[in-house]
Amino acid sequence: MRFVFLGPPGAGKGTLAGEISGRCGVVHISTGGILRAAIQKQTALGKKVQKVVEVGGLVDDQTVTELVRERVSHEDVVSGFILDGFPRTVTQARCLEDIVPIDYAVSIVVPDDVLVARLTGRRVCSACGSSYHVLFAQPKREGVCDRCRGVLVVREDDKMSAILQRLTAYRAQAEPIVHFYSERGKLVSLNGAPPISDVVLEFQERFAQSR
């Protein structure tokens, strides 16, 4: 099956997608991962993305869509995939439907107080980007990444003022996309507030009969 995961910052889209991918054999495709891979491989699109990223710009819709188009053409997604971080606009959602129609858009719903608690406690590896949390996913050694031994830092956009701005911006951005999938009967809401193991269980129960 083909899924799109929607949800505000801190909803746990990437964490849930990773868990589902490991348990169900569905490929997890993240926009960030696609961009990093393109830059690392120095493809034509990768070089274009690198120039934008180096000056702190935002990669345009067309470029991101082309990268997604290329990724979902690989053989490993034949049995299904979970898209995390795409689409971010209705234009991208329409393009995705033309490329490969999805089965469900899963909207992960989490109360604001829970989102804030999650985001303010997040720590990210400055070298490889791995994510940790001071309460829920602590590294083996405080302040040091388990994977690459890089230094863990608080991202600027994980500070309180930035978090509140991000949540406001997300709502404005997400409403049209949620409406887009709702109109097509593809929208499913999932409670993302409980522990991840419970959210995974609910996901599996919800979609077991759809396979």
Curated annotation (Swiss-Prot):
Residues binding AMP, per UniProt: 31, 36, 57-59, 85-88, 92, 155, 166
Compartments (UniProt record): Cytoplasm
Gene3D superfamilies: P-loop containing nucleotide triphosphate hydrolases (3.40.50.300)
UniProt feature coiled coil, ranges: none
Enzyme class: transferase
Pathways involved: Purine metabolism; AMP biosynthesis via salvage pathway; AMP from ADP: step 1/1
One GO biological process term: AMP salvage
Reactions accelerated catalytically: AMP + ATP = 2 ADP
Positions bound to Zn(2+): 125, 128, 145, 148
Binding site for ATP: 10-15, 122, 131-132, 194
Cell membrane keyword on record: no
Entry keyword set: ATP-binding, Cytoplasm, Kinase, Metal-binding, Nucleotide biosynthesis, Nucleotide-binding, Transferase, Zinc
Residue span of region NMP: 30-59
A GO term, aspect molecular function: adenylate kinase activity
Entry GO terms, CC: cytoplasm
Chain positions covered by the region annotation LID: 121-158
Enzyme Commission number(s) from the entry: 2.7.4.3
NCBIfam families in the record: adk
HAMAP family on file: Adenylate_kinase_Adk (MF_00235)
Free-text note on domains in this protein's UniProt record: Consists of three domains, a large central CORE domain and two small peripheral domains, NMPbind and LID, which undergo movements during catalysis. The LID domain closes over the site of phosphoryl transfer upon ATP binding. Assembling and dissambling the active center during each catalytic cycle provides an effective means to prevent ATP hydrolysis. Some bacteria have evolved a zinc-coordinating structure that stabilizes the LID domain.
Family: Belongs to the adenylate kinase family.
Main function: Catalyzes the reversible transfer of the terminal phosphate group between ATP and AMP. Plays an important role in cellular energy homeostasis and in adenine nucleotide metabolism.
PANTHER family noted in UniProt: NUCLEOTIDE KINASE (PTHR23359)
Quaternary context: Monomer.
Name of this chain's protein: Adenylate kinase
Gene name for this UniProt entry: adk
